[in-house]
Amino acid sequence: EFHPGTFPPSFGSVAPFLADLDTTDGLGNVYYREDLSPFIIQMAAEYVQRGFPEVSFQPTSVVVVTWESMAPYGGPSGSLVEEGKRNTFQAVLASSNSSSYAIFLYPDDGLQFFTTFSKKDENQVPAVVGFSKGLEGFLWKSNGAYNIFANDRESIENLAKSSNAGHQGVWVFEIGSPATAKGVVPADVNLDVDDDGADYEDEDYDLQTSHLGLEDVATQPFPSHSPRRGYPDPHNVPRTLAPSYEATERPHGIPTERTKSFQLPVERFPQKHPQVIDVDEVEETGVVFSYNTGSQQTCANNRHQCSVHAECRDYATGFCCRCV
């Protein structure tokens, strides 16, 4: 049985912040969808291109997942140590016919806690940022490829301050291609800052900064009461995870005997036609791949849109599928 603190699990995983999180107060939510719109496809391609300048990559599928205002699990006694602290972060999986990349995004002030109580042994354990293929083999099973890039307070706290793709808060990993024969390959582009500590962007590189749509599987707007206020403009959101190694170095600690290539299958979700929402609403969410709004919909006329692992809820602006 897997629980945080025992990474890697026996199943395949992509973990931008693996920890016991709590949504019972109704404020934290998880949103996910596959988006094939040209705008989202282009934005994902540009993030990958920024991290891997030598690669020509044009995704055919992009899956976007947002964890918004997640609270830490406080243990059986409801510990108040992390009371009021919330984490918001994103994972984007971009795939073509020959390769796959994971993009992790961490906004300013997006990570406010770094450890949680474990629901298994009631001890505090640090979150983990990593990847695993899970068990493999037939008669004799063993751990497949797995890589851990952050698993202590210092490296996790640095996720929103550093980068391996040259843009603060953005971390890019190649997770499926011939190049990953010995494991996940992280990007290796230094984060340049000027004398004032601000991000420095290459003059000849124009990263797409338009507000792109992030929605749940039902393609409805994010509930109006949920977004946390106080986040900066979305194009300043990308501040990325700091692995346990220095950002200027390759991860020498990846175990070569246990890391093997794996390709992430991308599951198809129901498609909608997103429209970009008002910028003011985007600025409240603090995410890069922002939310979209469509025509008014209700649970009653969209009975089969939600996953079997989600429940449908109606809001004033439409319905959404909430993970359970």
From Swiss-Prot:
Disulfide bonds: 299-312, 306-321
Biased composition, class Basic and acidic residues, residue ranges: 247-259
PTM info: N- and O-glycosylated.
Residue ranges occupied by any EGF-like domain in the UniProt entry: 295-324
InterPro entries reported for this sequence: Epithelial_Barrier/Signaling, NIDO_dom
Molecular function per GO: collagen binding; extracellular matrix binding; laminin binding; laminin-1 binding; proteoglycan binding
UniProt domain NIDO: residue ranges: 16-178
GO cellular component: basement membrane; cell periphery; extracellular matrix; extracellular region
Organism superkingdom: Eukaryota
Alphabetical GO biological process terms: cell-matrix adhesion; extracellular matrix organization; glomerular basement membrane development; positive regulation of cell-substrate adhesion
Location(s), subcellular: Secreted, Extracellular space, Extracellular matrix, Basement membrane
Residues with attached carbohydrate: 97
Pfam families (UniProt xref): NIDO (PF06119)
Assembly description: Interacts with FBLN1. Interacts with LGALS3BP. Interacts with PLXDC1. Interacts with SVEP1.
UniProt xrefs under PANTHER family: MUCIN 4-RELATED, MUCIN-4
Protein name: Nidogen-1
